[in-house]
């Protein structure tokens, strides 16, 4: 999530957190994993909260899309600094900042050993980053979607607000929808369900967790059909 990039800051990008993410991604990249990344923009601007303050929703969402491009460029630079090749693809044309996204370009880059960062959401307003990442995951025929957040999985209720909340290790999409759990927004959840794309929700802020998920350790929550 874009918000995770804030680290200890109130806003923007925490360079230490960015470097930690880059190192974790490098670690699994060196294991031969093909990686496509979609990152949010909540650390810079959220279209929906902008709309609540009187912004036109479409313009607000476009600002949010641009925020994801800023984060993608930052992550790309951090990855290159660790010696990993990274490519930013954008859902709207903005060469030379990034290349225009296509499924074939993304797959080609990943097969050539590059980490692909897919930015600017779906290129359309009214779609969240969750929906953007679900769409891209389905398009590039990913084996699994990893949703790195600030929480260590899916709970029966918000663990920050409800001390009795318990964590699911494993849950079906039907159960998520029935319980109204906020894993992702409804559109994204339904897309993953319909296209049989499993998700692992885990805490990305704990160093080493990404490698554990890839190694098959049971951390976070697996969502599947």
PLM features per residue range, with description:
Residues 1-225:
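C-terminal catalytic "cap/lid" subdomain
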């Amino acid at each position: 999530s874009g918000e995770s990039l804030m680290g200890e800051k109130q806003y923007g990008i925490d360079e230490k957190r960015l470097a930690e993410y880059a190192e974790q991604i490098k670690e699994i990249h060196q294991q031969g994993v093909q990686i496509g990344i979609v990152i949010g923009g909540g650390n810079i601007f959220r279209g929906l909260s902008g709309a609540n303050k009187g912004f036109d929703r479409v313009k607000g969402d476009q600002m949010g899309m641009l925020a994801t491009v800023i984060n993608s460029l930052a992550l790309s630079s951090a990855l290159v600094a660790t010696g990993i090749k990274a490519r930013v693809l954008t859902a709207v044309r903005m060469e030379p900042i990034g290349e225009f996204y296509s499924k074939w370009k993304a797959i080609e880059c990943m097969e050539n050993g590059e980490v692909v960062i897919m930015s600017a959401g779906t290129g359309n307003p009214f779609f969240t980053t969750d929906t953007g990442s679900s769409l891209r995951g389905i398009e590039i025929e990913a084996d699994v979607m990893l949703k790195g957040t600030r929480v260590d999985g899916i709970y029966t209720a918000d663990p920050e607000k409800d001390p009795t909340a318990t964590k699911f290790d494993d849950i079906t999409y039907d159960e998520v929808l029935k319980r109204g759990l906020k894993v992702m927004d409804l559109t994204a959840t339904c897309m993953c369900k319909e296209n049989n794309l499993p998700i692992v929700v885990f805490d990305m802020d704990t160093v080493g967790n990404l490698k554990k998920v890839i190694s098959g350790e049971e951390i976070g929550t697996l969502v599947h059909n």
